[in-house]
Amino acid sequence: MKIFICEDDPKQRENMVTIIKNYIMIEEKPMEIALATDNPYEVLEQAKNMNDIGCYFLDIQLSTDINGIKLGSEIRKHDPVGNIIFVTSHSELTYLTFVYKVAAMDFIFKDDPAELRTRIIDCLETAHTRLQLLSKDNSVETIELKRGSNSVYVQYDDIMFFESSTKSHRLIAHLDNRQIEFYGNLKELSQLDDRFFRCHNSFVVNRHNIESIDSKERIVYFKNKEHCYASVRNVKKI
């Protein structure tokens, strides 16, 4: 899940980035901060190009010609089930969300740092749970990666390729911005759907995320700049 932050106070914006990055790293959630900016139009442009569900943390009072609530209303046109969270120091402005019919997940008051951190994490947990529920309805395709006592849910679109691990019965999922080791086997993963193809004894690739293929060297390059290898027999089948 991609996370967007629109906050015109640089210190506050950096604080939110730190809170979210630490949460993602510690909890190993399939999330990333796609954009942190003071420009609402940059966020809106990203929302227009979204092909999955986003999570948006928006300051209500921005130093531009568009406020956070109006931005949320515009985002709704392109990401109707996205998670919109307003961050503000002005509780009296929350009524505007009903005027604009934004359907916000939460309002976080940023004057209390401890409360800010707790509420941001609560929102991320809720957004993650919603994503899992939507995936059960086939709205978003995800896979459960089992890591012993816990699991991580990852969207198909975030997967570059799977690789066999040096550890027995384990694989490594190469995602857009990180790697996850989990229990599984490549044969099952190659049968998820047509986009996943076993190009080598050690690799299953996501065809949708391939940038290019060097057929001579049998190297597959991905959108995140990683690469893997293909066998002589399978390189032309990718």
UniProtKB/Swiss-Prot annotation:
SUPFAM superfamilies tied to this protein: CheY-like (SSF52172)
Source organism superkingdom: Bacteria
Domain HTH LytTR-type, first and last residues per copy: 143-238
Alphabetized UniProt keyword annotations: Activator, Cytoplasm, DNA-binding, Phosphoprotein, Transcription, Transcription regulation, Two-component regulatory system
Protein name as annotated: Accessory gene regulator protein A
Function: Required for high-level post-exponential phase expression of a series of secreted proteins.
Keyword Transcription: yes
Modified-residue entries (4-aspartylphosphate), positions: 59
Molecular function per GO: DNA binding; phosphorelay response regulator activity
Domain named Response regulatory: residues: 2-125
Coarse class of the protein's main subcellular location: cytoplasm
Keyword DNA-binding: yes
Cellular-component GO terms for this entry: cytoplasm
Location within or outside the cell: Cytoplasm
SMART domains named among the record's database cross-references: LytTR, REC
InterPro entries reported for this sequence: CheY-like_superfamily, LytR-like, LytTR_DNA-bd_dom, Sig_transdc_resp-reg_receiver
